[in-house]
Amino acid sequence: TENTELRLRFQRNRDRDGSRPIFFQSGAENNCFPGTRSLGSYNSTSTDNTNQWYCGEIKPRDVYLNDAPVTQGFPPLLGIPSTLRGQPAGALIYDTRAGLPFSGVERDLDLFTASFRWDIMGSGYSMVLNGGTRDEDRKTGADSDHSQVNIIGPDINGVRALATGSSAARDTYEDWSGELRIESPQDDRFRWMLGVYHFEWENRNYRIDFASPGGQTRPSQIFDIINTGYFGSVGFDFTDRLSATLEMRSATERKGQIDWTQVPNVPAGPTAAAVYDSSIRGNDEWKSTTPRATVDFKLNEDVTLFAIWAKGYKPGGFNGAVAITNGRPLDESFKQEESVNYELGMKSQLMDRRLTLNVSVFKMTIDDIQLTTPITNATTGAVTSISTNQGDGEIKGLEIESRFAATDDLTLGFTYALADTKFTNGIDDFQFQITSGGGIFNPANPTDPARNLNGRGNGSIVGNPFPLAAKHTASLTADYSRPVFGGGYRLYVNSDLSYTSKKNIQVHNTAYTGSALLMGARVGIETDNWRAGFYGRNLLDESSAVGATRWLHSYLFGIPATAGPAATLDPGLPSTAVAAYSLPRGIFGTLRRERQIGLELNYKF
């Protein structure tokens, strides 16, 4: 009607994707930081390489999957011997049977959203109601050691066991959200807005194995989130040139988690015995108040200066049973991440509004940064990750955005972003291990000389950049469009070129994925109702890895006892009380999609 507007949208997705393109770089290729946590410390490997970590670019390599019987040969993984205790290792470590019943991603997703706006009695004051629901059923599976190793233990009650390091699961997700806002006319000199938001989410995880390829009937984990927030803003134009806006949001987020696994609970005291239960339960809540203040000043009709100050929060959560059963009870939960943000900038439209130029500088300070740490499940051997608070840090940066209408038909664009990140406080246990020659980090006594095996151990990550964050990103775009065939049709040509600098894969600041230069293009014919044309992605065939992270060289775990004591340490090494001999580090990465060229057809109705 004249005063109301309603929008409804329903979306159904059905995805059937193959295995993820993940490759593995063996610990036998490590080239820096010698020490005890290395393949060279074991007499069951084919290498004397004692390096614990890798320094340099992580480059793509072949992908090996354990999701189907092996029908052709492949090169063995570096560092694995041809025999173990006098027996051939091939059939033991490279089992030719499928190591897991499902690999890849299958997803059925239904989304529904609704938006209602009412101009209350035509007064200019508005009530806005937004809401949505999601219902998702997703199966995922992967060989989480990401290598050609495929160790399958003996059958369990006549059913094949999963390969060591593999995992598969079915997850169901249900969530809904709703938001109600009341706002004054936004072109008034004084304007305001008040609102409330509510969100509920539940995830049920079901284990997949060869006995239950569709997922077990009872969930192994249940996660839930309930978030309620109240928010508002006031804005005021002090003059025709100076205005300010103050926004505030107060939120409470409650997270719950249940792990149906036999795990030891955290002891009640230093002498208390571990108590086994059928479930580990977590239930906690985090509160936050996030203000944001913005001041705008118009130099003239074409140039506006602005300043922004804001606080932000990322709620904490639970790692649950996976942390407790693997000797990290202090990581059963992790804290809320907090940030303070400052930004100064300019927005402008110049040259008779043909040129849009926006520039800003910013600084962000972050406390209790949340990152992931890989660990091995002590029961299944599957490698997984937990969230941990790694310390504090800051980001300083610059952003430039511009668009230029070169002609009536051609528009050019340019963007650049600088993000200079660094930790200002933080300790990492593996940083101490690699710098000390393999010493076990003792948080109660970080300078313990007995564990500082080479005298150079230092767990500090202060000054190191954030992992997985590019310092430089930039892009160039060109959009060309003009009438053809008498004016009822338009020729369109779009092209883009983007650059991303290297990214360190972890807090150690030595291993990284390479820079990437990507080009895309589109060309075709369109009308108001339809579009037909060709597209190209990654036309330069950039091959650098999309991402990578530290992982575990896990073949030492899960070798049956019939092969003898395969993972025996070499003689003469430091005591296990002070030196680390847990699974040596390898690295996994994700391949980039190669050059793609295709045809696209779109029709509006």
Protein language model features and the residues they cover:
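Extracellular loop and loop/strand-boundary signature of outer-membrane beta-barrel proteins
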Residues: 97-102, 163-169, 177, 181, ...
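Transmembrane beta-strands of outer-membrane beta-barrel pores
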Residues: 12-16, 133-137, 198-202, 250-254, ...
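Gram-negative outer-membrane beta-barrel transporters
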Residues: 240-241, 363-365, 386-506, 600-604
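Repeated loop/turn-to-beta-strand initiation elements of outer-membrane beta-barrel proteins
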Residues: 3-6, 124-127, 188-192, 241-244, ...
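C-terminal beta-signal and adjacent terminal beta-strands/loops
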Residues: 498-506, 525-605
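Structural signature of Gram-negative outer-membrane beta-barrels, strongest in the C-terminal barrel
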Residues: 3, 182-185, 191, 197-199, ...
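Membrane-embedded beta-barrel scaffold of Gram-negative outer-membrane proteins
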Residues: 115-119, 124-132, 137-144, 298-316, ...
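Outer-membrane beta-barrel domain signature, strongest for Gram-negative TonB-dependent receptors
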Residues: 1-192, 356
